[in-house]
Amino acid sequence: MSAKISIFQALVFLFYRFILRRYRNSKPKYQNGPSSLLQSDLSRHTLIFNVEGALLKSDSLFPYFMLVAFEAGGVIRSFLLFILYPLISLMSHEMGVKVMVMVSFFGIKKEGFRAGRAVLPKYFLEDVGLEMFEVLKRGGKKIGVSDDLPQVMIEGFLRDYLEIDVVVGREMKVVGGYYLGIMEDKTKHDLVFDELVRKERLNTGRVIGITSFNTSLHRYLFSQFCQEIYFVKKSDKRSWQTLPRSQYPKPLIFHDGRLAIKPTLMNTLVLFMWGPFAAAAAAARLFVSLCIPYSLSIPILAFSGCRLTVTNDYVSSQKQKPSQRKGCLFVCNHRTLLDPLYVAFALRKKNIKTVTYSLSRVSEILAPIKTVRLTRDRVSDGQAMEKLLTEGDLVVCPEGTTCREPYLLRFSPLFTEVSDVIVPVAVTVHVTFFYGTTASGLKALDPLFFLLDPYPTYTIQFLDPVSGATCQDPDGKLKFEVANNVQSDIGKALDFECTSLTRKDKYLILAGNNGVVKKN
């Protein structure tokens, strides 16, 4: 009898183990696409997604490595990556990625590498699929995983702008503070991912994986620990819409880098073909702007590709008004270093002056109009601006630094105390290849990069004059009200959003410093 009982108990035990194993290792439900998740409540689920396979619309990683090569390594390194790409395309996917990593990162100083947070987020955000983003928004905890992109390239974009909780990318090997251009072993990367997924399964018990049909990224680990796996096909990506700027979880206000165009293979080819012509065009434009009178230089510059559009012509509207003893104060938003110069072009005046907070010595020497460096002392700076106004017209950019995106930084109120009449000037700039601004690069090259662009375009709009705050202001509030009103007027004219961010905020985000340029 005892033998029968023991056999019966053994059978029950084996059956129990079989059922338990089936429960623990039950095969997940495989789905063709994540769109069905939009109808589900995912607030208690952990979503694990493949960055390049399921989040980004483009399948090519070349543009992102080209951005690293150009912005962190320079023109020669980026050209080397470009000429090697035909060979890279013949390699296996994994080997091709290794070569691009080597060319882009070898010898780059780890401490000075800021492209991952200052340059790449703009281009990654422009490549995010709206449909996939809508799914991620519904999830509880979100984990982004990449088998091809280094951690330093994707972490800033995913954490800072898409609010992804955990980012698992490939770590880079570093020796003596410099990148070797080699990623850590894939096995170590898989172990990190394995431990992470196991932990999430134990904590929540609800894990959903989203990856691509065209990659084997952690397919075994996905199938072991995810209750559901959704596969994204290339055809799905082609039908995706791009994530609109208005839906960014965090607005992209600041970004750095010289390239204004996404360096796809064809765009990079055009960029390097334009190079020899760009040097000649920049030299000619610089000569014309410095040496030829405005009446002749403006049409010549327009013929060379530099465009200037002026609306609400201030010169024509002031012809019938009596002259003033003091010059006119023009207050404009700051887009590039050449803002005061283009305002002078629009006014058809060459004796106009401007003040700067921090300008390289080379730029001061090359400037065709007089520039005066401010000391950041309110009293002495105010006196300097009043003196300049007695000599003629003055252009100021109270933001203190440039901003590329449709936002206005806080306006310093100092300009409101030096003139009774203030003319707000709304400025917009469009470039094709190169930005004429930088936060972490050589600021002396800012005008050069602007002139290297094929069709740099300025639009100047003179707004209605406003009264300053030179009268008695005992509580000190009027100057801030005037500054905010001028900022608001320019923002409305340009359809830009006004912010309270400052120069210091920008440089801390992009360059890790306070934005003061040392005299060279």
UniProtKB/Swiss-Prot annotation:
Residue ranges crossing the lipid bilayer per the database entry: 5-20, 64-84, 88-108, 264-284, 286-306
Primary localisation category: membrane
Catalytic activity line of the entry: sn-glycerol 3-phosphate + an acyl-CoA = a 1-acyl-sn-glycero-3-phosphate + CoA
Tissue: Widely expressed at low level. Expressed at higher level in seedlings and leaves.
Entry keywords, A to Z: Acyltransferase, Lipid biosynthesis, Lipid metabolism, Membrane, Phospholipid biosynthesis, Phospholipid metabolism, Transferase, Transmembrane, Transmembrane helix
Keyword Transport: no
Gene Ontology cellular component list: membrane
GO biological process, one term: CDP-diacylglycerol biosynthetic process
An MF annotation (GO) of this entry: glycerol-3-phosphate 2-O-acyltransferase activity
Localization of this protein: Membrane
Pathway(s): Phospholipid metabolism; CDP-diacylglycerol biosynthesis; CDP-diacylglycerol from sn-glycerol 3-phosphate: step 1/3
SUPFAM superfamilies, A to Z: Glycerol-3-phosphate (1)-acyltransferase
Pfam families, per the entry: Acyltransferase, HAD_RAM2_N
Motif (HXXXXD motif): 334-339
Domain notes: The HXXXXD motif is essential for acyltransferase activity and may constitute the binding site for the phosphate moiety of the glycerol-3-phosphate.
Role according to the record: Esterifies acyl-group from acyl-ACP to the sn-1 position of glycerol-3-phosphate, an essential step in glycerolipid biosynthesis.
Membership in a protein family: Belongs to the GPAT/DAPAT family.
Name of the protein in question: Probable glycerol-3-phosphate acyltransferase 3
Organism, scientific name: Arabidopsis thaliana (Mouse-ear cress)
